């Protein structure tokens, strides 16, 4: 069973991961695709794959039921080598989590080469590649396990349209847990720690997925999908950044994933009924369904 799939930055490669403990990389050419590589290294089902920004090289992260996060890199062989071309190697094996690592998420590239990891052991880890080595922080986040994690845009909302923009880069992310909560974390450069700045309550069952909208206009949006058959869209205005309000969207099935369009104005929701629905905010600030996509 395939659990996750992701296109690289250029849309030329697709990585998939599966219950068979492997990751497969396909080359996409027009309407066709070709299996280019099968990566083996995990000892359990692989839940998540995530491509890093190409400015850091061709790097892929994967997380698994085995409690590990693996970082893979494509190394280009010497043109004079008999096996000229490229080969994938495992460059980092992070195994400090004591239970399944359910999701990995790369930070916006402006913030650096940072990977956040969400685990069923209740902890979040943040890996950073700097000066040719990997460092990590690991900290407790949700008592009953962390299911999902998503970074905020590097620029604060309103910074593009403000006459007095604030400091440029922020390191901030949201987590969703089996305690039914969302938590927002901010990095403190002085203490070099991630601290909870907000806890968002509203769901009555596990939060399965969270997604921070990439939009950096006047508002911030976070979508959360829950076992309670609802999606909540949390909104915070740049004029009052600590205040979050939510709007609830109701469904007939358990919900698994939420995903924003690149511009951050359309939300895709998928659940247990094999449907994807697309939602958009109207001029009154209400979220409306604009399309259903069925298999």
Curated annotation (Swiss-Prot):
Disulfide bonds: none annotated. GO terms for molecular function: structural molecule activity. It is found in: Cytoplasmic vesicle, COPII-coated vesicle membrane; Endoplasmic reticulum membrane; Nucleus, Nuclear pore complex. WD repeats lie at residues 1-36, 41-82, 96-137, 141-195, 202-244, 250-289. SUPFAM superfamilies: WD40 repeat-like. It comes from the Eukaryota. One of its GO terms (cellular component) is endoplasmic reticulum membrane. Keywords: Cytoplasmic vesicle, Endoplasmic reticulum, ER-Golgi transport, Membrane, mRNA transport, Nuclear pore complex, Nucleus, Protein transport, Repeat, Translocation, Transport, WD repeat. It is a peripheral membrane protein. GO terms for biological process: COPII-coated vesicle budding; ERAD pathway; mRNA transport; nuclear pore localization; positive regulation of DNA-templated transcription; positive regulation of ER to Golgi vesicle-mediated transport; positive regulation of protein exit from endoplasmic reticulum; positive regulation of TORC1 signaling. Gene3D superfamilies: YVTN repeat-like/Quinoprotein amine dehydrogenase. Pfam families: WD40 (PF00400). Its main location: membrane. Belongs to the WD repeat SEC13 family. The COPII coat is composed of at least 5 proteins: the sec23/24 complex, the sec13/31 complex, and the protein sar1. Component of the nuclear pore complex (NPC). NPC constitutes the exclusive means of nucleocytoplasmic transport. NPCs allow the passive diffusion of ions and small molecules and the active, nuclear transport receptor-mediated bidirectional transport of macromolecules such as proteins, RNAs, ribonucleoparticles (RNPs), and ribosomal subunits across the nuclear envelope. Due to its 8-fold rotational symmetry, all subunits are present with 8 copies or multiples thereof. Component of the coat protein complex II (COPII) which promotes the formation of transport vesicles from the endoplasmic reticulum (ER). The coat has two main functions, the physical deformation of the endoplasmic reticulum membrane into vesicles and the selection of cargo molecules. It also functions as a component of the nuclear pore complex (NPC). NPC components, collectively referred to as nucleoporins (NUPs), can play the role of both NPC structural components and of docking or interaction partners for transiently associated nuclear transport factors. This is Protein transport protein sec13.
């Amino acid at each position: 069973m395939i659990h996750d799939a992701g296109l690289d930055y250029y849309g030329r490669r697709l990585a998939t991961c599966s219950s068979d403990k492997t990751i497969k990389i396909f080359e996409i050419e027009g309407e066709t695709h070709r299996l280019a590589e099968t990566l083996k290294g995990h000892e359990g089902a692989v839940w998540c794959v995530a491509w890093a920004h190409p400015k850091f090289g061709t790097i892929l992260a994967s997380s698994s039921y085995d409690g590990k996060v693996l970082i893979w890199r494509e190394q280009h062989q010497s043109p004079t080598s008999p096996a000229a071309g490229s080969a994938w190697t495992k460059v980092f094996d992070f195994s400090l989590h004591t239970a399944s690592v359910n999701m990995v998420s790369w930070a916006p590239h402006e913030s650096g080469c940072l990977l956040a990891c969400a685990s069923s052991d209740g902890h979040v880890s943040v890996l950073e590649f700097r000066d040719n080595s990997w460092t990590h922080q690991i900290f407790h986040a949700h008592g009953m396990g962390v299911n999902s994690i998503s970074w905020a845009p590097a620029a604060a909302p309103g910074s593009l349209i403000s006459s007095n923009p604030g400091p440029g880069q922020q390191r901030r992310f949201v987590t969703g847990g089996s305690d039914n909560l969302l938590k927002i974390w901010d990095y403190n450069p002085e203490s070099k720690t991630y601290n909870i700045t907000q806890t968002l309550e509203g769901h009555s069952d596990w939060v399965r997925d969270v997604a921070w909208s990439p939009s950096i206009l006047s508002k911030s949006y976070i979508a959360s999908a829950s076992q309670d058959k609802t999606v909540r869209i949390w909104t915070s205005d740049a004029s009052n950044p600590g205040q979050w309000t939510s709007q609830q969207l109701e469904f007939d099935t358990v919900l698994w994933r939420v995903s924003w369009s690149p511009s951050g104005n359309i939300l895709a929701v998928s659940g247990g009924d094999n449907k994807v629905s697309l939602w958009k905010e109207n001029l009154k600030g209400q979220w409306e369904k604009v399309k259903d996509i069925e298999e």
